Amino acid sequence: GTETANLQIRVFGWSQSGFEEQYRNQREVIGSPPVAKIEPGQKQLVRLTRTKDVPPGQELAYRIIIDEIPSAQPPVAEDGKTAAAIRFQMRYSVPLFAYGAGLWSKEDSARQRDPKGIGLPQLSWRTVAVERRPYVEVRNQGAVHARLTDVAIKQGSQSKPLAEGLLGYVLPGAVMRWPAPGPVAGELAGRINGAAKVQSIPPAR
C-alpha cells in the first residue's frame, strides 16, 4: 500500500464447542513483536515462540489474529486538504497447529517422518434440523484437525455445494454444523486438508 500500516499481533488458543469457534487468551505461543509499524513497500517478520511443550500425541490449535490499528491522522488529498474517505479496519486470522511428540500431519522435506506418527482426521456426518432448517453436522474423532473445502452433497449426477472453497475446520473431538442448500439426501464429499482428490465422508452410524 501507499500508507504506513500499524498492526497488532495476538495469538489465541482455539477450540470449538456448541458448534461455535471459541478463543481464549494464552501464553503457550507468543508472537513478537506484539505491535508492528510497517512502512509502504516494506515487510515485517513475526516470530512465534512456544513456551510450553505440547503433550505427546496431541494437536493444539491456535489462531494468529492480526488487526490493523487505524491511524489517528485522516488521509490527506494531493492539494493538502483533508480527504473524505471511507476507512476500513482490516483483520487477518491465520490458523496455527502445534504437535506433541509422536504425532504429525504433514510431510517434512528436511527429515524423515515416522509413518506410525501420522495423524488423520476421522470424520462422519449426519443431517439435523435447527428451527426447521436443514443442517449438515460433521464430527471429527481423529487426532488432528480437518480443513474442509469444496464440500458438496451428491445425489446421482447432481451436486449441491455447501460452500465454494473453504467451508471451515473441524478440530479433534469437535462437532461443527453448516446450513444445507435444501433437503439433504445422498453422499457428502469434499477435499480434506488440501487433498488433490475429493473424498467421501462416511455417514454417522
Name each model feature, range by range.
Residues 1-23, 141-159:
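Short acidic, flexible loop segments centered on an aromatic residue
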Residues 5-7, 27, 34, 42-44, ...:
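Envelope-exposed proteins and targeting segments
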Residues 10-12, 32, 99, 121, ...:
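A structural detector for beta-sheet-dominated domains
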Residues 19-54, 157-187:
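Intrinsically disordered, low-complexity Pro/Gly/Ser/Thr-rich segments with frequent PxxP/GP/PP motifs
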Residues 1, 112-133:
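Beta-sheet-dominated interaction scaffolds and their linkers
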Residues 49, 135-141:
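Short edge beta-strand/loop segments characteristic of extracellular beta-sandwich folds
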Residues 2-11, 27, 49-50, 95, ...:
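Gly/Pro-rich, tryptophan- and cysteine-flecked surface segments typical
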Residues 51-113, 120, 184-205:
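Terminal connector regions
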